[in-house]
Structures are given as C-alpha cells and as structure tokens.
Amino acid sequence: MTRKKDSKYNGYIMMLRRDQVGTRMTELVKQIMDNGSEADQQVLEQVLTGLAQKPAKQQTYINLLFGFETEFTSDGLAMTMPVTSLVHNTLGIVHGGVITTLADTAMGTLANKMVPEGQAAVTTEIQVHFFKEAAGSRLVCKCSVLHKGRQTMVFESKVYREDGIMCGHSTGSFFIVPKKN
C-alpha cells in the first residue's frame, strides 16, 4: 500500500473504533441509568460532567473527576472538593487516598505556581496524618509554604471538614525540574 492509502486506511479503522466505543459507552450509560442506584447515577453524572469540561479547562482529569476548585490566597492556596459517593470507601466515608490526593494536588498546584518559567515541581515525598472522619458535603485543603529553595520546596496542608474541624494534616516535599513541553 502507498503511504496515502495507509493513511486513509488508518483513518477508516480509527473511525470504526470510535463508533464501537461510542456504541459501548451508550450501552454502559443506559445500563447504569436503567439498573444503577441513585448514587451510581450521581457518580456517572460527576464523571461525565468533569470529562465534558476538560476541553475548556487546562486541568488534569483528577481535578475534574473529583471537582477540585482552587483559590490562591495571600498566604498560600485553598482547594475545595465536594464529598460524593465517588470518593467514599467501603465504610461510606471519604477514602484516605482521596484526602491524600487532595492534599498532594493542592501543594503541587501551589508549588508549580511558584517555580520560575520553564520549570515544574514534582512530589518527592508526602506524609499524611488523619485525625477525624471527613464528614459533610465539602472538604477544604489549605496549604502554605514551609521552605522554598533553589532545588526543593516543602509545603504543609491541612484538610478541614465543612464544620471547620481539621480531619487531616500533611507535609510534602517537591523537587524542581525542567518542564517538559
């Protein structure tokens, strides 16, 4: 086959795959809407809403999936997230890994805001301590800088329930690296 024919053939195969995926997605959504619980349907809506916002926002899938909202403050950053069935563990409470992800994302967002142009910050270590159940309908993570050096940064974050009670505390170390294009 010539290169032009290869390209046309590959485009046709991709279109067929897209149609198959679209059909499968439609079947899965219908199955959840027909047989799923209300919580299943809410999780599906949250996932699809996050994905629908992806092209319009320069955010990660994690931010969109969990509904993270960021506000830079005079002393750092506050990141909030809704508490939904998507983030519950088998006990029906917020999974510790999700709280850790919230803290890491908040600290990483602040770290990447602070690095010089052409550089990025990556997590090298994170410690998390849980104090209370993360109850309520929203969590807020407040983070601040403990140390900013030429090659490393250290941050502290505190995760609060909507009633103001701290449910988690973490520190994170970040290494400054060249940004990949």
Q: Which residue stretches match the model-derived regions?
A:
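Terminal targeting signals and extreme-terminal segments of soluble enzymes
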Residues: 2-140, 146-181
